[in-house]
């Protein structure tokens, strides 16, 4: 069952990338990202409110969001910054690169998590995992070769660097999740980190995008922006 859910999550993330690419086409990046965080937080907000004011409704279910203090929330805020950093790099990179390049680079993220788990948590990889790591390295090399045929130089293209940084930050988030999940409720983390991202994005929008909005790519509404949030939350 868990393996089936993992495959379903991967499929949903595939649609998430497609909707994200369509939303970013000829569009302003930061407003799209802000709306994604806003809609994602609105999806989880009812669970937070019901758990706080009518705890008996969701109590004992997987949708229950425990009420905790700042001593716990501060760890979730850190996760919000890590994830948002990954998204900012990833959104800018995806806007300027084809999905055929972005997808395979993002696919190396689980390998980074494996290596990080080995270095940080002292875990040991089995033979099949080592084979997977080596295949990922070879695939990345072959991808850089094929990218040159499309006019994309991996060494001198800043958008490639952005996607790589997004993957690294995503791997760091995955490792941090492993640390958090040992002591915190998954729904607690999932719900509140989306909410905190909205508050983090507000000054970014007001200070970095809004004053210069007329000098850059204009923002246009696209219904696929809502689909980004829906498919991401479902995958998570």
Predicted segments with their positions:
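Active-site phosphate/pyrophosphate-handling residues
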Residues: 22, 100, 179, 187
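Alpha-helix initiation and capping sites
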Residues: 158, 170, 174, 186-189, ...
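Juxtamembrane helix-loop boundary signature in multi-pass membrane transporters
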Residues: 1-11, 111-171, 178
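Short helix-kink/termination motifs in transmembrane helices of multi-pass secondary transporters
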Residues: 14-19, 84-89, 115, 168-179, ...
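Helix-coil boundary and interhelical linker segments in multi-pass alpha-helical membrane proteins
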Residues: 1-2, 50-60, 70-71, 116-129, ...
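Specific alpha-helical transmembrane segments that line the substrate/conduction pathway
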Residues: 79-83, 94-143, 188-199
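Membrane-interface interhelical linkers
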Residues: 1-20, 25-30, 35-81, 87-97, ...
